[in-house]
C-alpha cells in the first residue's frame, strides 16, 4: 500500500506540472541526441518518459520509427497533437515504463532523459528488465540522469552502485558528467547491449 501511495503522489505531482510547461520541456532536443542521430543510421527508437514528444519527434524527422511512452495522459495528448501537426507517424503510448507489456522490440535506440532517475528504487529493476528485453543486440541506451552521492531512499538520481549494476547488463561506452542548472550533479551515459 505504501508503494501505491508514493507512486500515486508522484504521478499526481508530474500530472500537475503539465497544466503549465514543465521545466524539463524545453522544446529543443539536446546535442547528445543530435550527435547520436548524426552518427547512426535510422532504425527503431523507444523514448522512455517521452513527455510531450520533443525528442521522439526529432528522431522521427530524421527517419527513425519511434515509440514514445509516458504515464501522464496530458503529456501523451500533447505529444500526439504535436505529431499530428507535424505529420510525423510517432506511436505515443500511455504506459508505465516499469510494465511495457504491449510494446515489442527490438529497438536500436532507447532514450531516457530523466525518467529512470525519477523512479523509486522498487521500480528500477522492472525498468531495466524491460530495457534489456526491448533493446536490440548492439542497440544503444542513451541516458541522462541526475546523480547522487549517497543512497538516500526517495531521492532522485542514480548512485555509482546503480550505474555499476547497469554495467552488469549493458556495456558503458561513454560517460560525461556535468551539472544541471549549475548545481545538480548529472551525467549523460551511453550504454550498448552486447551483439548477439
Task: Show where each model-derived region lies.
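Short catalytic micro-motifs in class I SAM-dependent methyltransferases
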Residues: 114-118
